[in-house]
């Protein structure tokens, strides 16, 4: 099979250099811009943008647990054009471009550019998180940069110490991007792994470890000192992180057990879907071992036909879907790729491929990234899919290395063709997902064919229902002269503060989140009462959080009743209360 692949692509060799030098980088630069104006979600996406805009009002837990990402968002909003949602999205899209391009040029030292491009294209296509949620994308950017400098430091002859310190700086700063990134300190195992396979002296390994720790402390320490200077000492930061660590009392999915259980559940589900593949591969191997060397192309044709039937079966069972407006179109294919990648990385780390020490280290690095990335998140294994910039190209490279190691025997065709099928399906599904997906908005396939006359989001396309209901709400706020008032939002509508430029009256625009304590909410309302403030209250009517946390809802209703609020607008989606 390997000879056939090589001979087929040999004639294209003359195009490889210009493609790798010019075309692929341009595609990786521009591909993330697709969909920058798609969708107008009023939950997570615009919640983050609202936090950047009104950062001075954000409660200390959220401010400090995602400090650098909040400050970065605030800074980006000052850039040309970033005062609109489209402009902000465009600027943030280049973070994804940067991760892909930096990884592309770094990995070209070890593997062909076309292979890296396929991996980077897949990585960009699977980025599901809204581009404005910077505590995700800065996390992946700093993790990617830290890992690259770590590997460069281990492999370098010159400037080794500098690279290791810089690696530590990026990973240390990443804790200030998002506090759970503390788990990334476990990447020091890469240093120890490299020392083990190269038989470095213990003193040399300890020296490299110390340099990484020095950089880590400096990266974290500089930003921490900045918070101390800006917020009157360390107490504010320590208090915010202490509140974060106590958050699990009201949000079970943020406990260590809950997060680990979700990760294992995702792997378990995907493995259960892959069980049918094992007998297919075994049957294929047996078929090629029977009458060896005879009817090879007939056998290959029959096996590929069987793989097409298997893909059709996965579509019929809902493992793969054609709903390119939602995650399930690509999630299981991506998880199959990751699971296969774990196998390849394990094999590569153990040295079974008889590759170089660099190859072993890259394999172990990809394995560590797969294991570490989802830690600290309650989003199953989705963080891995958003952070494949180093992982995907290394998996593809190890796949080719394993093919080379196993040789050209025909019985290898079944497992090789299955992995190739997964890659092709993922490439196609991922590309279609990237082109069509928008976070929440139109996730059921409803066309996004409408725009709003609201200045900040006028360039965004959304569903007709979303556009109509938001326009009606905006008009009602204007008619009642409420657009200049502060606002209290409840019912999974935090993004309204950003969309309508409404300053929050309390320290969050999403008080109905489980992670926001009832005591905090009660205290904020008491503060409004004491100050005699009666902000506009906008209630989302279709929020599941209202029924799940009645205590907050009841407290809000008591506040409304006690301050002579009236309903000035009501639709099937929103209720507006005003005390005027």
What are the language-model segments listed below?
Residues 34-51, 60-76, 82-83, 230-235, ...:
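Extracytoplasmic catalytic/substrate-binding loops of multi-pass membrane glycan-assembly enzymes
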Residues 431-514, 534-546, 572-573, 577:
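Short periplasmic/luminal acceptor-recognition loop of GT-C membrane glycosyltransferases, typified by
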Residues 103-125, 162:
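Transmembrane-helix signature of polytopic, membrane-embedded enzymes
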Residues 4, 184-221, 225:
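Perimembrane helix-loop-helix junctions
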Residues 90-112, 287-289:
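Transmembrane-helix motifs of polytopic, lipid-linked glycan transferases
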Residues 131-140:
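Short acidic/glycine- and proline-prone juxtamembrane loop motifs at membrane-interface regions
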Residues 149-173, 202-211, 359-366:
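Short hydrophobic alpha-helices at membrane interfaces in multi-pass membrane enzymes
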Residues 126-128, 162-190, 214, 218, ...:
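Membrane-interface alpha helices of multi-pass inner-membrane proteins
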């Amino acid at each position: 099979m390997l000879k056939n692949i090589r001979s087929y692509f040999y004639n294209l060799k003359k195009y490889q250099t210009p493609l790798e030098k010019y075309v692929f980088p341009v595609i990786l630069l521009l591909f993330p811009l697709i969909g920058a104006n798609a969708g107008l979600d009023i939950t997570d996406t615009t919640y983050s943008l609202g936090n950047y805009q009104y950062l001075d009002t954000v409660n200390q837990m959220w401010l400090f647990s995602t400090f650098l990402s909040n400050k970065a968002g605030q800074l980006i909003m000052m850039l040309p054009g970033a005062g609109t949602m489209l402009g902000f999205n465009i600027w943030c899209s280049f973070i994804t471009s940067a991760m892909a391009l930096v990884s592309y040029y770094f990995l070209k030292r070890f593997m062909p550019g076309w292979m890296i491009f396929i991996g980077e294209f897949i990585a960009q296509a699977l980025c599901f998180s809204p581009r404005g949620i910077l505590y995700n994308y800065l996390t992946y950017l700093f993790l990617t940069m830290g890992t690259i400098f770590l590997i460069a430091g281990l492999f370098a002859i010159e400037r080794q110490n500098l690279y290791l310190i810089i690696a530590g700086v990026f990973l240390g700063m990443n804790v200030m991007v998002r506090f759970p990134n503390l788990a990334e300190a476990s990447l020091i195992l890469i240093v120890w792994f490299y020392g083990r396979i190269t038989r470095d002296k213990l003193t040399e390994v300890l020296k490299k470890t110390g340099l990484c720790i020095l950089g880590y402390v400096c990266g974290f320490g500089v930003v921490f000192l900045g918070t101390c200077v800006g917020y009157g000492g360390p107490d504010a930061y320590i208090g915010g992180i202490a509140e974060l660590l106590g958050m699990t009392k009201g949000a079970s999915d943020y406990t260590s057990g809950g997060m680990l259980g979700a990760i294992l559940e995702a792997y378990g589900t995907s493995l259960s879907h892959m069980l049918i593949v094992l007998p297919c591969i075994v049957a294929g191997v047996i078929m090629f071992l029977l009458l060896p060397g005879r009817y090879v192309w007939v056998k290959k044709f029959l096996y590929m036909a069987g793989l097409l039937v298997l893909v059709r079966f996965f579509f019929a069972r809902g493992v793969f879907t054609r709903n390119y407006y939602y995650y399930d179109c690509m999630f299981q294919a991506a998880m199959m790729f990751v699971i296969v990648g774990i196998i390849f990385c394990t094999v590569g780390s153990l040295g079974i491929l008889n590759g170089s020490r660099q190859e072993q280290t890259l394999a172990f690095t990809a394995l560590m990234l797969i294991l570490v990335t989802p830690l600290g998140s309650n989003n199953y294994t989705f963080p891995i899919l958003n952070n494949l910039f180093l992982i995907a190209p290394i998996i593809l490279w190890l796949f080719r290395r394993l093919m080379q190691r196993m040789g050209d025997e025909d019985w290898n065709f079944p497992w090789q063709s299955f992995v190739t099928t997964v890659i092709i399906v993922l490439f196609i599904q991922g590309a279609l997902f990237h082109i069509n997906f928008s976070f929440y908005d139109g996730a059921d396939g409803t066309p996004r064919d409408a725009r709003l006359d609201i200045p900040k989001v006028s360039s965004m396309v959304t569903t007709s229902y979303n556009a109509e209901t938001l326009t009606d709400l905006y008009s009602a706020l204007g008619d009642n002269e409420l657009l200049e008032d502060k606002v209290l939002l409840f019912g999974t509508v935090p993004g309204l503060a950003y969309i309508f430029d409404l300053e929050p009256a309390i320290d969050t625009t999403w008080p109905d989140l489980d992670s926001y304590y009832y005591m905090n909410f009660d205290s904020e309302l008491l503060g409004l009462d004491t100050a005699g403030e009666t902000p506009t209250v906008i209630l989302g009517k279709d929020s599941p959080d209202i029924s799940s946390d009645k205590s907050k809802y009841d407290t809000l209703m008591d506040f409304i009743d006690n301050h002579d609020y009236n309903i000035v607008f009501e639709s099937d989606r929103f209720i507006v209360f005003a005390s005027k």
